[in-house]
Swiss-Prot record:
Part of the 50S ribosomal subunit; part of the 5S rRNA/L5/L18/L25 subcomplex. Contacts the 5S rRNA and the P site tRNA. Forms a bridge to the 30S subunit in the 70S ribosome. This is one of the proteins that bind and probably mediate the attachment of the 5S RNA into the large ribosomal subunit, where it forms part of the central protuberance. In the 70S ribosome it contacts protein S13 of the 30S subunit (bridge B1b), connecting the 2 subunits; this bridge is implicated in subunit movement. Contacts the P site tRNA; the 5S rRNA and some of its associated proteins might help stabilize positioning of ribosome-bound tRNAs. One of its GO terms (biological process) is translation. Keywords: Ribonucleoprotein, Ribosomal protein, RNA-binding, rRNA-binding, tRNA-binding. The keyword Cell cycle does not apply. It comes from Hamiltonella defensa subsp. Acyrthosiphon pisum (strain 5AT). PANTHER family: 60S RIBOSOMAL PROTEIN L11-RELATED. This is Large ribosomal subunit protein uL5. The gene is rplE. One of its GO terms (molecular function) is rRNA binding. It comes from the Bacteria. Belongs to the universal ribosomal protein uL5 family. Transmembrane segments: none annotated. The keyword Transcription regulation does not apply.
Length: 179
């Protein structure tokens, strides 16, 4: 199992039990899933871009991505309903913990001009969303083989009831939040 999962079981649960005075260990918030999303709007005109994005996302997540399709037709973007315009991956279990560990120890330190993650990116229910402007911060991506630099949305879903609990959970994992 991933070291971060052991760290959660040994240290984070005890910290959260003391901080929020939960009656049971089962009340302690935990990370349930991580969703990675890559929107490729240019895929309408060039199908190879979507294939490139899918291979990059598969390398980052070690899982085959799902193609996302347009829900509505938008004439301004020349998109019809059902056109493939992106891809996403939902990570759970062992792969989720391994990705979270790589994100914290390798990928986030490689972000250019990084000043910390925003504390305002919580959704009101303890889930955290962040955007990465370049997929090349991940070591699995071969810099010479990329066709185009894509952005990446990362959604961390937790069982926390509030933003304060979610922030305390992610801060216990040593997420580099702004002061």
């Amino acid at each position: 199992m991933a070291r971060l999962h052991d760290y959660y079981k040994d240290i984070v649960i005890k910290e959260m039990m003391c901080k929020f005075s939960y009656a049971s260990v089962m009340q302690v918030p935990r990370v349930t899933k991580i969703t990675l999303n890559m929107g490729v709007g240019e895929a309408v005109s060039d199908k190879k871009l979507l294939d490139s994005a899918m291979s990059d996302l598969a390398a980052i997540s070690a899982q085959k991505p799902l193609v996302t399709k347009a829900r509505k037709s938008v004439a301004g973007f020349s998109i019809r309903q059902g056109y493939p315009i992106g891809c996403k991956v939902t990570l759970r279990g062992k792969r989720m913990w391994e990705f979270l560990e790589r994100l914290l120890s390798i990928a986030i330190p490689r972000i250019r001009d990084f000043r910390g993650l925003s504390k305002k990116s919580f959704d009101g229910r303890g889930n955290y969303n962040m955007g990465v402007s370049e997929q090349i911060i991940f070591p699995e991506i071969n810099y010479d083989a990329i066709v185009k630099i894509f952005g990446l949305d990362i959604s961390i879903t937790t069982t926390a009831k509030s933003d304060d609990e979610g922030l305390a959970l992610l801060a216990a994992f040593k997420f580099p939040f702004r002061k």
